[in-house]
C-alpha cells in the first residue's frame, strides 16, 4: 500500500478535505501545464506532450523552469540557446513567439511572465515536481533519480547540486 494519509473514524468532511490537501501526488488542476524535469525535460497538457514548432522553444521553456521564476533578459536567453553565437536576434524572436503562441493555444497565457524584454516562468501556474520540491511539498529522494533535464547542457549545474543534496 502506498498511502499518502489516512482517516480515523468518525469520518468528517473536514478530515477528508485535510487529507485531500496533503496528497503526496496532488490531483492536477484542469488547464494546468505539467512540466517534467527529472530525467528528460517534457511538457504535458491534459496528459499529452505539447508540440512546439521550434525545438528551441521547448529549450527556452526548460531554461525558464531551471531559473525558477527569475526574469531572464533576451540577451541571456540568446546566450544560452545559441551558446554565445551572435546574429540570432530574428530567430530568437521566432522562438519566443512560438513559445507564447503555443501556450496561448492551450489557454495557458499565464505561464510566462513578460516584463520589458525579460521572460520568466510563473511557478504557481504550472505543475512541476521540481517546484514542489523547492516549496517543501515533496522530499528530493521521492522525485529525483539522478537525472535532471538530461538533454540540455545548461542543466548540469542544477543537476550536480541536486545530486549533492540527495546524497546527504
Question: Which residues does each predicted region cover?
Answer:
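Intrinsically disordered, low-complexity protein-interaction/activation regions
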Residues: 8-168
Amino acid at each position: 500500500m502506498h498511502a499518502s494519509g489516512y482517516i480515523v473514524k468518525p469520518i468528517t468532511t473536514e478530515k477528508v478535505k485535510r487529507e485531500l490537501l496533503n496528497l503526496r501526488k496532488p490531483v492536477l488542476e484542469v488547464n494546468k501545464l505539467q512540466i517534467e524535469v527529472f530525467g528528460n525535460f517534457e511538457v504535458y497538457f491534459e496528459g499529452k506532450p505539447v508540440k512546439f514548432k521550434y525545438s528551441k522553444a521547448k529549450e527556452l521553456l526548460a531554461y525558464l523552469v531551471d531559473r525558477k521564476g527569475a526574469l531572464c533578459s533576451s540577451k541571456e536567453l540568446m546566450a544560452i540557446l545559441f551558446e554565445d553565437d551572435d546574429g540570432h536576434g530574428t530567430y530568437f524572436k521566432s522562438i519566443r513567439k512560438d513559445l507564447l503562441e503555443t501556450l496561448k493555444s492551450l489557454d495557458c497565457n499565464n505561464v510566462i511572465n513578460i516584463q520589458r524584454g525579460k521572460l520568466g516562468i510563473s511557478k504557481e501556474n504550472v505543475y512541476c515536481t521540481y517546484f514542489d520540491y523547492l516549496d517543501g511539498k515533496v522530499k528530493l529522494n521521492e522525485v529525483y533519480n539522478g537525472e535532471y533535464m538530461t538533454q540540455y547542457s545548461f542543466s548540469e549545474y542544477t543537476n550536480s547540486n541536486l545530486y549533492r543534496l540527495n546524497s546527504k
